Design a protein with these regions (language model features):
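Charged, gly/pro-rich active-site loop segments
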Residues: 1-16, 88-170
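Short, conserved active-site entrance elements at the starts or edges of catalytic domains
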Residues: 8-41
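A generic local structural motif
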Residues: 20-22, 47-48, 66, 130-131
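Short secondary-structure boundary/capping segments
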Residues: 26, 51, 71, 133-135
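Short beta-strand segments
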Residues: 31-65, 71-73, 79-83, 91-95
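Short, intrinsically disordered, mixed-charge
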Residues: 74-79, 110, 114
Length: 170
């Protein structure tokens, strides 16, 4: 992993990736909604709230096939997920892929159930009696974003700030 301190002009130390990872893996309920940024076919940006879950070094989210975000990802899989976690804001760039293997779908269905939404896995996607209105009608596809680059900014009160970019090995 390549790391660059974006706050060295202020004499601040770089943020270790372990700090971001600790926030991602804490299991604390999020008070802020993660947002997914995609690109429309004409190049205009699109941003939508998603229920993102960090699992095994990757971010997962769901979306209905007919939604703008899913249609955008079908044309251009590059995307960004931004989130505010305890003590750190993160922006994670990566490439989204639709997940179809049953083992991963079952594992992530359990992770979502642990957070209060218990989808069933049916025909390579999630189903349930409800989801976020922006997800479109069921079934909902599961997507995985493998991080390529991430940016972190410390937000904890009472400590010096910091900003760091991390580039991950492909």
């Amino acid at each position: 992993m390549d790391q660059k301190n974006l706050a060295d002009l202020y004499g601040l130390d770089p943020i270790p990736w372990s700090r971001a990872l600790e926030a991602l893996e804490s299991g604390e309920p999020r008070t802020q909604t993660p947002f997914l940024a995609t690109t429309r076919p004409d190049g205009r940006p699109h941003v939508a709230a998603v229920g993102a879950i960090w699992d095994d070094g990757k971010l997962y989210f769901t979306s209905g096939a007919g939604t703008r975000k899913s249609r955008n990802l079908a044309q251009n899989a590059n995307c960004v997920i931004s989130m505010s976690l305890t003590g750190i804001d993160l922006v994670v760039e990566g490439i989204a892929e639709r997940v179809t293997d049953d083992r991963t779908l079952q594992r992530l269905a359990k992770r979502y159930a642990d957070q209060g939404w218990a989808p069933a896995v049916t025909d390579g996607a999630f189903t349930h009696e409800y989801s976020a209105p922006s997800a479109g009608p069921p079934p909902w596809d599961l997507y995985v974003v493998t991080p390529t680059t991430a940016f972190g900014v410390l937000t904890a009160q009472g400590e010096p700030g910091g900003a760091t970019r991390w580039r991950f090995d492909a």
